[in-house]
Regions:
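Bacterial N-terminal signal peptides that target proteins for export
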Residues: 1-9
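A generic "folded-domain core" signal
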Residues: 19-157
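Hydrophobic h-region of N-terminal signal peptides that target proteins for export
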Residues: 10-20
């Protein structure tokens, strides 16, 4: 019995050392000019059909935006965000060529889903429209969104 206990202590120690570190928060509170704030996701890398590009989700109390270095194509109306296994939420509009906007009910739905979710699958389409390269997706972590949202609500009024 005694030798069995001494064998388990080193085994348990090695097991604890090999445990994965906690995942870091993927969201940052950013103060913007004019006194407002927004939440910025970590940037995700995807292809635009021709080259690698980045996409980032930005959230304010009234809007959810996806920004990219590449030019978006909304001609088919299929730009969307799907949180976990929820139904995908379609974008409302583009703001310029490089920003996809979700506002009103779409933004409210996404913000509620971001608080409860683990990941967001962002589906995008890029210009040029010919030859068409289809949609391209990037998965963004929602770890830390709720904590960042609460911080924004408390400190950015």
């Amino acid at each position: 019995m005694r030798s069995t206990v001494w064998w388990w202590i080193p085994a348990l120690s090695v097991g604890l050392l090999g445990a994965a570190p906690p995942e870091k928060d993927a969201w940052t509170l950013t103060k913007v000019q004019g006194g407002g704030c927004r939440l910025d996701s970590d940037k995700g890398t995807l292809t635009d059909g021709y080259q690698k590009t980045n996409a980032q989700i930005r959230v304010t109390p009234t809007e959810v935006r996806v920004v990219s270095e590449s030019t978006f194509d909304d001609s088919k109306g299929d730009l969307s965000i799907q949180v976990d296994r929820q139904e995908a939420v379609k974008a409302d509009a583009l703001d310029g060529a490089k920003v996809v906007v979700f506002k009103g009910p779409a933004a409210s739905t996404l913000i509620a889903q971001f608080k409860a979710g683990l990941k967001a699958n962002v589906t995008l389409r890029f210009w040029p429209t010919w030859p068409e390269t289809g949609t391209h997706s990037v998965v963004m972590s929602l770890i830390g969104f709720t904590r960042a949202w609460e911080e924004m609500q408390a400190s950015c009024r």
